[in-house]
Swiss-Prot record:
InterPro entries: Kinase-like_dom_sf (IPR011009), MAP_kinase (IPR050117), MAP_kinase_CS (IPR003527), MAPK_p38-like (IPR008352), MAPK_Sty1/Hog1 (IPR038783), Prot_kinase_dom (IPR000719), Protein_kinase_ATP_BS (IPR017441), Ser/Thr_kinase_AS (IPR008271). Keywords: Activator, ATP-binding, Cytoplasm, Kinase, Nucleotide-binding, Nucleus, Phosphoprotein, Serine/threonine-protein kinase, Transcription, Transcription regulation, Transferase. Its cofactor is Mg(2+). This is Mitogen-activated protein kinase hog1. Belongs to the protein kinase superfamily. Ser/Thr protein kinase family. MAP kinase subfamily. HOG1 sub-subfamily. It is an enzyme of class 2 (transferase). It comes from Aspergillus clavatus (strain ATCC 1007 / CBS 513.65 / DSM 816 / NCTC 3887 / NRRL 1 / QM 1276 / 107). Dually phosphorylated on Thr-171 and Tyr-173, which activates the enzyme.
Length: 365
């Protein structure tokens, strides 16, 4: 049984195993607080993410289970990796990952990026996406604050809590507005890996310009700003809109012509503009894929087809349509944690763990 230590961070109780010391807050998200810490076992700095009340509702339980399964499955140099996971006596879940010094949002607000950094960061984002997409996963919430970077300029994509299966029937608004693909705004349903390419294009443009490309004040304004630059969506894209209200809105907009991006990005490398043109395309089917983008001339200094791996197997989404009670998600979560720590689930300890789920008395680190 692990020994747990409590600390107050921003009024939130962090209850972590004694393996981790020197807690310092580094970020707050909608679903959890992240602290830096030192791993006593390895001597390395780590990030500890507390998932708030993971078992309070079936929806939150499923979301936490999904993020855990994804972090366990996705193993790639440009994806954040899970080094530890545990459930505290208070039944909060903690994910422990490597700690990177900053994120792209902080970098972009501090200074303009030089060309070689823009190239290298974009290359690593696309290299990570090639792997993620090959696993049958769509991130859905790519934005500069989800792109972590260390002092060596190594880049890792994080926060897979919103990620979903590649599925023609996806729903809802999920990504931060500035980076949201038009098909999410227009259809609310049918979208796929291409939404991540659009988001990456918006991030790429922000690296080139030093400010967001489409800073919409709301959803309507967001779409209007997009059409000012990229023109009115083609008819075949408009025909895919499912919502009658959205369809009326789009048809009410004045007809606009697409502006050459070279006019907006006057100081950018022509190859950079060409790649951006291929990423920011209304029709998802005509948008460049991660694999194709990696082979683009702009990324030739870094492109190496022998070192841009795909996933060995697809992610198992069989749980995703399940509508289960909290206690069942809890049992599944504990099972995943036991598996992560290579604990035999047939032994007496794991039996005791399962029996004690309702009371939250059994905890493994």
């Amino acid at each position: 049984m692990a020994e747990f230590v409590r600390a107050q961070i921003f009024g939130t109780t962090f209850e972590i195993t004694s393996r981790y010391t020197d807690l310092q807050p580094v970020g707050m998200g909608a679903f959890g607080l992240v602290c830096s810490a030192r791993d006593q076992l390895t001597g390395q700095p780590v990030a500890v993410k507390k998932i708030m009340k993971p078992f309070s509702t079936p929806v939150l339980s499923k979301r936490t289970y999904r993020e855990l399964k994804l972090l366990k499955h996705l193993r790639h140099e440009n994806i954040i990796s899970l080094s530890d996971i545990f459930i505290s006596p208070l039944e909060d879940i903690y994910f422990v990952t490597e700690l990177l010094g900053t994120d792209l949002h902080r970098l972009l607000t501090s200074r303009p990026l030089e060309k070689q950094f823009i190239q290298y960061f974009l290359y690593q984002i696309l290299r990570g996406l090639k792997y993620v997409h090959s696993a049958g996963v769509v991130h859905r919430d790519l934005k500069p604050s989800n792109i972590l970077i260390n002092e060596n300029c190594d880049l890792k994509i994080c926060d897979f809590g919103l990620a979903r299966i590649q599925d023609p029937q996806m729903t809802g608004y999920v990504s931060t507005r500035y980076y949201r693909a038009p098909e999410i705004m227009l259809t609310w349903q049918k979208y796929d890996v291409e939404v991540d390419i659009w988001s990456t294009g918006c991030i790429f443009a922000e690296m080139l310009e030093g400010k967001p490309l489409f800073p919409g004040k709301d959803h309507v304004n967001q779409f209007s700003i997009i059409t000012e630059l990229l023109g009115t969506p083609p008819d075949d894209v408009i025909q895919t809109i499912c919502s009658e209200n959205t369809l009326r809105f789009v048809k009410s907009l004045p007809k606009r012509e697409r502006q050459p991006l070279a006019n907006k990005f006057k100081n950018a490398d022509p190859d950079a503009v060409d790649l951006l043109e291929r990423m920011l395309v209304f029709d998802p089917k005509k948008r460049i894929r991660a694999t194709e983008a990696l082979a683009h001339e702009y990324l030739s200094p870094y492109h190496d087809p022998t070192d841009e791996p795909e996933a060995e197997e697809k992610f198992d989404w069989s749980f995703n349509d399940a509508d289960l009670p909290v206690d069942t998600w809890k049992i599944m979560m504990y099972s995943e944690i036991l598996d992560f720590h290579n604990i035999d689930q047939g032994n007496d300890a794991s039996q005791a763990l399962a029996e004690g789920l309702g009371q939250g008395q059994q905890n493994f680190a």
